[in-house]
Amino acid sequence: MVHSIIGFRSQDLVILEKEFEAASTLVKKMSDDGTWGTKGLVTDALRQLIESGEQYDQVIAIGPLIMMKFVCKLTKEFNIKTVVSMNPIMIDGTGMCGGCRLTVGGETKFACVDGPDFDGHLVDFDVAMQRGATYRDFEAHAREEACNLFAKEVQ
């Protein structure tokens, strides 16, 4: 059996809903603002399922780092194996540039060659989030300076 918990900030960001329903025996839908499914976080639904007696051999978490961090914190509490799919910046795909460097179990790993899937209980999410924020200012600037070719009005 496959149980899926899918979460989005709001209804207008929902993707792959039908695909999750087709691949799952149970789907819990969560949104931060309550415009889709149940208002709350994926960890709320996961905790509820576990505490209601559902047994899981493995949890797979894919999404924002902060979400995966707290899914792992929860599953560790219940001793449930958890795999996370890490997607840091990958430049050359060989591990030589170090752009996708992660700390997993106290060791340096490269998502492009060693992953992208890792034991979530061993990933240092704080370091991964810190590294992920490296280009935040550059990305914000790129959004602000985006091409206005399709804008109705250019200021």
Q: Would you name each region that the model predicts?
A:
Residues D32-G37, D57-I62, T108-F118, Y135-R136:
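Short, basic, helix/turn surface patches
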Residues T43-D44, K69, G95-G99, D124, ...:
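Short amphipathic alpha-helical patches
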Residues M1, L16-V27, R47-Y56, D117-Q155:
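Iron-sulfur (Fe-S) cluster-binding modules
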Residues L65, N87-D117, E145-F150:
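Local cysteine-cluster metal-coordination motifs and their immediate loop/turn environment
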Residues M1-I91:
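FNR/FR-type flavoprotein reductase catalytic core
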Residues L74, I80-K81, M96, C112, ...:
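Alpha-helix boundary/interfacial micro-motifs
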